Structures are given as structure tokens and as C-alpha cells.
Amino acid sequence: MRVRDGSWSSRQTRLVDGAVESVQRMTFPAPVVERTKAGARKLGDVYWRELRRSTLGVFRTSTANDEFEIRLLGRGPALLRFSRGEEAVSADTVSCRYPIVGGLLARGPAGSIRFTQQGTDVVAVTSAVEGFLPRLGVIYAPVQSRIHVALGRRYFTRLQREAGR
């Protein structure tokens, strides 16, 4: 398969059980992070920093009880709660996955958000929500999904800047 540098794609799917999947993908001419656990963590860290930056601080992240949380203005109940990031590194892939464990916007502990860089020369980076069960499925597509897609574009731009490309 030939990968074109700079190509962008986005896909949203709603599964039979109501779970949603949203995948944004962009290619780069070279790796944007090292193929190490630190590189895997950086994929996640850049996304969470970009969440706060691009929403002007409306959505803020914090760590509590070995969980990672997103809160509105950093207060009140968690909108989404995640387990600690799980880094994975192989010969041509580096990724960081955050299992969803709850929050006001989740129907329960299901799904994850995963950030992956795959390839060795030209690489594909993905931001993927997998198997997420939104509490309010009717507002997921018009609200949460759009936020994830817009944030995905900003995330890829930030990765590119930080990699100096």
C-alpha cells in the first residue's frame, strides 16, 4: 500500500450496540515521535494538552486515584474518566491507549481512545475512539464527534510542529 504524505482521513461509525468509533488519520514524511514508551506517552500528552489549548481551557484534564479525567473548567464531576495510559511499542508501531472507565458522558466502562504512529519512513498517525458507549447517543454525532474530529486536526498540526516538520 502506498501512503501519501500529508493525507488526512476521518471516519465515524455507530455500531449495533450503540457504541461509536471515530478514527482520524494523517500521514507524515517521517516519524513525529520516537519509537519508545516515552514516544508513546508523548502521543497522548500532546493530545490532552491540545484539548485544553484548543478549547481555551473549557475542557481540562487532571489525574486522580490513578485515573485521568476531563472536567468542564476543571470542576464538578468528570465528563470522562480514563485508566492510566497503556503504552505499546513494536518494530514499526508506537501507541498509547486510554481505556474509558466512566464519567457523565459515558454509559459505563467501555471503549478507549488510542493514539498510534505506524510505519518507519512515511508514517500514519491515528487518533481513534474505539467502542465508546455514549450516555446521550443522540448528541454524540452533532457534538462529541465533531469536537473529536476538530481536535484531531489540531492534534496532528501540533504533532507536526513539535516534530519540527
Language-model regions: role of each:
Residues M1-G74:
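Charge-rich, low-complexity N-terminal segments
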Residues I139-R165:
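A conserved amphipathic terminal alpha-helix motif
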Residues N65-E67, P99-G103, A128-F132:
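Generic short beta-strand segments
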